[in-house]
Each structure stands twice: as C-alpha cells, then as structure tokens.
A protein has these predicted regions:
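Helix-breaking motifs and short loop linkers at transmembrane-helix boundaries and internal kinks
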Residues: 34, 86-92, 103, 228, ...
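Helix-loop-helix hairpin linking two adjacent transmembrane segments in secondary transporters
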Residues: 90-92, 121-175
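Helix-to-loop junctions at the C-terminal end of transmembrane segments
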Residues: 54-66, 248-260, 345-346
Length: 380
C-alpha cells in the first residue's frame, strides 16, 4: 500500500471524527452550554452547511497545485476544531463548526483526484477506497474514543484531539504525497459545463437518496425497543456496524476496478434497499437485525468510492467541483433522511417504519444507478 494514500486517509479520518462525533457528544455540549438538545443539534447543521459552502469554493483554487490545496484544507480543519475546543459560548461554537465543515467536501474532492493520479494502472477505484477508509475507521474507533473522552473528561478535548491530529496530517501529506500534475484550467464557466450532462445528476441523485435512505433508519432505538438489546450493548453493536463500513468500502474499491464502478454501486444500493425492507418485517429477530444493520453500513460505504470515481470521470473540465459535490449530496441526504425518518415517529408509528421509508429512498437510488450503468457503462 502506498504511503501517499495512507496520508490521504489520515485526512479523511480527521474529517470523519469531526463530522460524526457530534452525535455522541451532543448531550455533554448541551449540558455544559446550558442549551437544549434540539438547540445543540443545530451544530450538526452548521457543519453540513460548511460542507455545502466549502465545496464550490474549490473553483477559486483551481489553478493551484493539488498538494498545496490539500495542505490549506487541512489547515482550515485544524483552525475550526481548535476554535471549537476553545469556544466560550454557543454562537462561537456554531461558527467554529461551520469553519470545520468548509474543507470537508473539498478535501474529498481533491483527495480523490490525487489518489486516482497516484494509483497503479487499473486500480483507481481501489486507491480512492483507501483514502475513504479513513472515514470508516473514524466511525469504528475515532467516534467511540471521542465520545468516551467527552463523557469522562470534556467534550472540548475531543475537538482538541482532532485539531492536534491535523498537525500529523499536515506532516504526512507534506512528506508522503508527491506533487501531481495540475488539472487543465477550463476557466470559471468551464468548471460548471459538466452539469449540462445527465450523468453527474444521476450519480448525485443516487448519492443523496441512497444515503438518505440509511439515515431515515433510527438504528439505536430500533435495536433497543424492537430487537430487545440493552442500552449498554449498543457500543458493541455500533463497533460491528463500523466493521461493516470498513469491509464494504475496501471490497467495493477492488470490485470497481475489476467490474464497472456504476454496476458495483448499483448492486450495493440494491443491497441496502433489500436490507432495510427486511428490517421493517424482521427487526424483532435480534440476531438478524444486527446482520441487516451490518449489511446496511457495508452498503453505505460500498457505494462511496465508486460514486466518487464516477463523478471524477463524468465531470470533465470541472473534476474538483464534481468530486467535491459528492459530499454535498451526502450531507443533503443526511438531512433529508433524518427528517423523513422522523415523520412516522411523530404520528405514533413504530420504530420499524423509518426503515420502510429508507428502503423506498434506497430503491430510487438503485434505479438511478442502474439507469446510469445501462446508459453510460454497459454500452462502452
């Protein structure tokens, strides 16, 4: 495995912890800042807004070396998380979370392009999956560690840890990632030209709806209220889900190089659809629900690297914007899925019904990817 790809994965590890740890430390922040859980939840939205704003800003940096852009993005991540650790009140923390989100999509976009350029011939998807592996490891180890630090000591230490990790990322990107050839400058308008074609919209739509399908599904209350697991066992179950993410990401990276990435993504999306549908009908069978949970998380990250690679390949002239837009679609899916998944709970339906809605979202994502494969890949 190339050291340069490991350095890129260090970056997605830091971004993954920064994004997802908020779910675990939200109660501690709310208590410390004397705000409600609902108000504290807006800190998640602030990060997502930063992701959406930061990705298009890559257009400004299109003429700079890709390695230098990565270093600047890591620097912004450090500043945002260190400011969060030192935040004196809710609004300062809100701004810090917004700043922390700015480099997220941009880093994934630039990092994916660099990873594919550094890959051996015919192994571009696998290289991108190695970079994305940092995100899966963040969910497996980083988020539980950050949550434990918050519970035992202070939530500020969690953000401080991510900020300090940024120093290591800067060092290893500087040392291990070589300078790569710049992308051709197609001008400001040329960066958006790829959006006139159908292919990127199919991929982005599938990303948003497929991810939204998984985020519809309220896994923790389903496991405790329907499957009968204790609250204490959730940590172990979430680790199992994390292993599913790691496995799904790495396996799909290899398969995408052997077969068509659109085909692999469509199959993974179909797996999510079926798994969520089975959750709705069979969640009361505890061991089966755990297996289905792992299949869902594996599928979620099995579609990540193929979709990232596809956006690079089908956004000629605007590769950085195209690759970064995957994370924008991902975060929009988070918001839409969480909202729609909560609707059946608000009207008094059980915890199984969000999975049914999620299955519908995933099915539409599957149809979009299948259409993409048939139109753009099978005919080539």
């Amino acid at each position: 495995m190339k050291k340069s790809l490991i350095a890129l994965a260090f970056g997605t590890l830091g971004l993954g912890i920064a994004e997802f740890v908020m779910m675990g430390i939200l109660p501690d922040i709310a208590k410390d800042l004397h705000i409600s859980i609902a108000t504290a939840g807006h800190l998640i939205s602030a990060y997502a807004l930063g992701v959406c704003v930061g990705a298009p800003m890559l257009i400004i940096a299109r003429r700079y070396p890709l390695k230098h852009i990565l270093l600047v993005l890591v620097g912004i991540m450090m500043i945002g998380n260190l400011c969060a650790a030192l935040a004196s009140n809710y609004w300062v923390l809100m701004i810090a979370r917004f700043i922390s989100g700015l480099p997220h999509g941009a880093y994934f976009g630039v990092g994916s392009i660099v990873a594919e350029k550094l890959a051996d011939k015919g192994r571009g998807s696998e290289a991108v999956s190695i970079m994305i592996a940092g995100m899966t490891i963040a969910n497996l180890f980083g988020v539980p560690l950050g949550t434990a630090l918050s519970t035992m000591l202070s939530w500020r230490l969690t953000f401080l840890l991510v900020g300090c990790w940024g120093i290591a990322i800067l060092y290893y990107i500087w040392r291990w990632v070589p300078m790569v050839e710049n992308l051709p400058d197609t001008g400001f308008k040329g960066q958006f030209r790829f959006l006139k074609t159908q292919a990127p919209w199919l991929i982005l739509g599938a990303t948003m709806l497929g991810n939204g399908g998984v985020f519809c599904w309220y896994s923790s209350p389903l496991l405790t209220q329907v499957s009968g697991f204790s609250a204490e066992s959730l940590t172990v179950l979430m680790v199992l889900a994390g292993f599913g993410m790691v496995a799904g990401n790495l396996i799909s990276g290899r398969l995408s190089d052997k077969y068509m990435p659109g085909r692999v993504a469509a199959i993974a999306q179909g797996m999510i659809c079926v798994a969520l549908l089975l959750v709705f009908f069979l969640a009361q069978i505890s061991w089966l629900n755990v297996l289905l949970m792992c299949l869902c998380t594996a599928g979620l990250f099995a579609v990540s690297s193929p979709q990232q690679v596809l956006l690079i390949r089908y956004s000629k002239g605007g590769e950085m914007l195209g690759a970064a837009s995957v994370q924008v679609a991902f975060n929009l899916g988070n918001a839409i899925g969480a909202y729609c998944g909560g609707l059946p709970l608000e009207v008094g339906l059980g915890y199984k019904y969000p999975a049914l809605i999620g299955s519908g979202f995933a099915f539409i994502g599957f149809l979009l990817l299948t259409f993409f494969y048939r139109k753009y890949e099978r005919t080539t």
